[in-house]
C-alpha cells in the first residue's frame, strides 16, 4: 500500500518533455537505425570487416563479420611490391621474438654497376701517368732551398759547440802538463838530496830507508793517478 501511495504521489512526466517523445518514437528510431546500418554495410562491405550493433550492450556491441572471422591474414589488403621499400613483411623484421636488422635490397642499376668489371686499360694508363710524371722545376728549386737552409742552421749550431770542445781540451792538456812537470821536479830534488846524503854519510839507519821507500811509493801512486786522469780526459 505504501509503495502504491508513493507512486501516486510522484509527478507524471509531462507530454512535452524530450524523454516522453523519445519513448513514444522508439520503434521508428530503431527502424531508421537499421536502415542506416544496412546502407553502411552495403557501401563499405569491401573495405571494413568490423561492425557495430548499437542495440547490443557495450561488451558485445562490436563483432567481426563472418567472411573474416577465421582469416587474420592481411596480405590480401596490403600489397608488398619489390620496388616499394616503405612496406616490409613482418617475418623479415621479427624472428623468434627478436627484432632483426633489415637491409635494403640493392636495385637493378646498383647491381649492374657492381657486376661491371673494371677497365684494365684505364687503370694501366693511370699507373703509367704516375710513373712517367716528372717533378716540376719549381718544386725541385724549393727542395734545394729548404735543404740549404737546414744545413746552414745545423752549421750555425755546431760551430760554436766545436769551439767550446777545443777550448776545454786545450785547458785539460795544459793542466796535465803542469802537474807532470811539478811531479818530475819534486822527484828529482828528492833524488838529489838522497844522493847527497849517501855520499856524505855512508851509514844510513833502517828507519830512514823505510821512510824513504814509503815516500817513493806514495809519489809513484800520485803519478799513476795523474796519468790515469789525463788518459780519461783525452778519451
Swiss-Prot record:
The organism's place on the tree of life at top rank: Eukaryota
Keyword Nucleus assigned: no
InterPro entries linked to this entry: MAKR6
Region (Disordered): 108-140
Keywords (A to Z) from UniProt: Abscisic acid signaling pathway, Cell membrane, Membrane
GO biological process: abscisic acid-activated signaling pathway
Compartmental location: Cell membrane
Keyword Protease: no
Feature: compositional bias, Polar residues: 130-140
Principal cellular location given in the protein's record: membrane
GO-annotated cellular components: plasma membrane
Family annotation (PANTHER family): MEMBRANE-ASSOCIATED KINASE REGULATOR 6-RELATED
The protein's role, per its UniProt record: May be involved in abscisic acid signaling by acting as a kinase regulator.
Name recorded for this polypeptide: Probable membrane-associated kinase regulator 6
Originating organism: Arabidopsis thaliana
Amino acid at each position: 500500500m505504501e509503495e502504491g501511495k508513493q507512486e501516486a504521489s510522484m509527478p507524471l512526466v509531462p507530454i512535452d518533455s524530450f524523454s516522453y517523445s523519445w519513448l513514444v518514437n522508439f520503434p521508428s528510431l530503431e527502424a531508421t537505425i537499421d536502415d542506416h546500418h544496412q546502407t553502411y554495410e552495403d557501401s563499405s562491405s569491401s573495405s571494413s570487416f568490423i561492425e557495430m550493433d548499437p542495440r547490443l550492450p557495450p561488451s558485445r556491441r562490436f563483432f567481426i563479420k563472418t567472411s573474416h572471422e577465421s582469416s587474420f591474414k592481411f596480405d590480401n589488403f596490403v600489397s608488398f611490391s619489390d620496388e616499394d621499400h616503405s612496406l616490409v613483411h613482418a617475418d623479415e623484421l621479427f624472428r623468434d621474438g627478436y627484432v632483426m636488422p633489415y637491409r635494403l635490397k640493392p636495385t637493378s642499376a646498383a647491381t649492374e654497376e657492381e657486376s661491371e668489371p673494371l677497365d684494365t686499360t684505364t687503370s694501366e694508363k693511370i699507373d703509367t701517368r704516375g710513373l712517367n710524371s716528372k717533378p716540376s722545376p719549381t718544386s725541385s728549386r724549393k727542395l734545394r732551398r729548404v735543404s740549404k737552409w737546414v744545413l746552414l742552421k745545423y752549421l750555425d749550431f755546431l760551430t760554436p759547440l766545436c769551439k767550446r770542445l777545443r777550448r776545454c781540451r786545450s785547458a785539460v792538456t795544459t793542466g796535465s802538463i803542469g802537474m807532470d812537470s811539478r811531479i818530475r821536479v819534486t822527484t828529482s830534488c828528492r833524488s838529489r838530496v838522497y844522493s847527497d846524503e849517501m855520499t856524505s854519510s855512508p851509514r844510513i839507519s833502517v828507519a830512514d830507508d823505510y821512510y824513504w821507500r814509503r815516500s817513493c811509493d806514495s809519489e809513484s801512486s800520485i803519478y799513476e793517478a795523474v796519468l790515469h786522469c789525463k788518459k780519461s780526459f783525452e778519451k
